[in-house]
From Swiss-Prot:
Phylogenetic classification of the source organism: Bacteria, Pseudomonadati, Pseudomonadota, Gammaproteobacteria, Alteromonadales
Pathway: Porphyrin-containing compound metabolism; protoporphyrin-IX biosynthesis; 5-aminolevulinate from L-glutamyl-tRNA(Glu): step 2/2
PANTHER family registered for this protein in UniProt: GLUTAMATE-1-SEMIALDEHYDE 2,1-AMINOMUTASE (PTHR43713), GLUTAMATE-1-SEMIALDEHYDE 2,1-AMINOMUTASE 1, CHLOROPLASTIC-RELATED (PTHR43713:SF3)
Keyword Isomerase: yes
PROSITE patterns: AA_TRANSFER_CLASS_3
Protein's UniProt name: Glutamate-1-semialdehyde 2,1-aminomutase
Cofactor: pyridoxal 5'-phosphate
Amino acid sequence: MTRSEALFEQAKKTIPGGVNSPVRAFNGVGGSPLFIEKADGAYIYDADGKAYIDYVGSWGPMILGHNHPKIREAVLAAVHNGLSFGAPTELEVQMAEKVIAMVPSIEQVRMVSSGTEATMSAIRLARGFTNRDKILKFEGCYHGHADCLLVKAGSGALTLGQPSSPGIPEDFAKHTLTAVYNDLDSVRTLFEQYPIEIACIIIEPVAGNMNCIPPIPGFLEGLRTMCDEFGALLIIDEVMTGFRVSRSGAQGHYGVTPDLTTLGKVIGGGMPVGAFGGRKDVMQFIAPTGPVYQAGTLSGNPIAMSAGLAQMEALCEEGLYEALSAKTKRIAEGFKAAADKHGIPMAINYVGGMFGFFFTEQEQITRFDQVTKCNIEHFRTFYHGMLDEGVYLAPSAYEAGFLSMAHGEEELRLTLEAADRVLARMKAAM
């Protein structure tokens, strides 16, 4: 028994399922999860001391790589001044100014401690501002585990085969309408059915919780048009895509302006941070300037703000996003080339620092229903083959992969050589 396996057995005695977030349990791929002891650059190291090239990156935040010296130094410097004050700090102001400077649609921003808090608060704000109850989301998109959003969700809920979750009253769920991602007709049908009841649309601009599915041309623009037509707010959930797809997020990459934006992951530099922001007239509706209540004991935590600011400043380096996109393209297209070489059907998607691959004969994956038809057994075999080769991918067929600036030529080469060997073994076993 490895030390990771022993720790997993020990953890299950005191922690439900042995993990503090379901996808970490390896239910989507089988076997026991790795327990990680440390990380540096493009690598993570398990409890047995084995190194892995990491394409999870803590599920997105580690865009510069693990243990980046600038972030580490910023955190250590902040710790000397105290861990938490429960009062405003200059760091919060600096972070707000940095976010607003990088994302033109955000005129004011409120810090929170998680992506779930950000989306939950943005939904409440949209409902309060419009005085409407219903929200519109998309099947397979995940916006955290708030009751109103855990309906036909992606991420861990999809991995577990649960389109929603027990514990959510029907009275809550009935206010959540679900449309088909990349299908404007399905959205219009719902707006025509509830023309004055929908407070907002919330969407992942690149769906990263049913693997990786970018928007088709015109889709995000069409949502903007319909929101304007029916008086609803457009919330773009950039918890995953914010500052990863481009310096101004997916909205900047695709040229779409939302009313509200939710952020997380990258802005924390590895610390627990979320945020929501947008039009000033909407944001002024939040307490203490408005009637919609939202609060948080650790919101704007000085240690988290220090880590986030250090990362955000580093992301302003010229040419960084072009280099990150080139790395991502090489991995995604390299996987596809290796699969083609060995006669194993595969489709790929990638944008910015995100990528996805699907074992399927479908040429292009653009919708949730297509994702559910992919070959999960092939994914599981490939996953464990890559793990044995020292490559750590997301342990679910429904999660995007992430590159970092720490992934260099050596890591990319080793990853693609490993993929070639694993796919060759898979073909030989068919």
